[in-house]
Amino acid sequence: MRGKQKLFAVMLGVVSVIAFISCRTRVETREHSKLETRNRFDEIHFPNQILWAWERPEELEFLDSQQFAVAFLAQTLVLKNDDVEYKPRRQPLKVKPDTRLIAVTRIESQKTTALPAALNATQKQKLIDLILKTAPLRNVSAIQIDFDAARSEREFYKTLLQELRQKLPDNIPLSMTALASFCIGDRWLDDLPVDEAVPMIFRMGTDSRTIKTFLTSGNDFREPLCRRSYGIALDEPLEINFDRSRRKYIFNVRPWTEKDLLALPQEVH
């Protein structure tokens, strides 16, 4: 009887060691993959200051193209039942010939009908095809996807990004926007095939005070993909220590003017 107990104890110990090694390997592999996530923006020496240009006329020929880039809304795609409604940009955008651009695609789910978005393979393929068409546009150096992912939509968007990354030219950066709360305590951004997840540190709703307190206390975003850039608004100044090495995406509620650049916080430059 004692021999069987001893054998059982030895076997239990071996199983525990194997389980520990397996668990540690998975953790190390995940951390290793995070460290090796490419940053194509750095590879192509992309400017660190980027102005968002939404659906309105924008005259940005005053920008220094060595310091500033422009992320312009190229299209809005609305998921309606089992279809995709295409809304192209209709407002003019004027920039210098050498200004580098990011083509932004906004994806929304139609919520005014009784039928929710199907989130099926056909819709996903339509989205990918339409997004890919923005890559060859003049002066476009990168692609950005802007969406609000409900918990039930996350798997759809994850596979969308995975398939989109596979079809994009390897040298084109893929960016996405992310709620700041995702960057602090949500694991769903893990292993997404993007070069950055831009934390939107403005218009944060009920999370605003909590997140601003978290950042002004000297804390940083826990998700590595969120530690490559900031998404801020000109009319919502933040008292945080900006990391100057990170890209800053800046939103303005009105069309940009040269005077607006003077209002940018010194830490943003």
Where are these regions (language model features)?
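C-terminal active-site rim and adjoining tail of enzyme catalytic domains
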Residues: 208, 213-215, 219-269
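Conserved, mostly hydrophobic/aromatic
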Residues: 70, 145, 197
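Bacterial N-terminal signal peptides
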Residues: 11-19
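Active-site beta-loop-alpha junctions enriched in small/polar residues
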Residues: 52-56, 75, 106-110, 148-150, ...
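Chitinase-like catalytic core of GlcNAc-active glycosidases
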Residues: 45-47, 80-194
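N-terminal Sec-pathway targeting helices
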Residues: 1-12
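Boundary/entry segment of secreted carbohydrate-active catalytic domains
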Residues: 24-67, 73, 86-89, 99, ...
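Substrate-binding surface in catalytic domains of secreted glycosidases
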Residues: 165-233
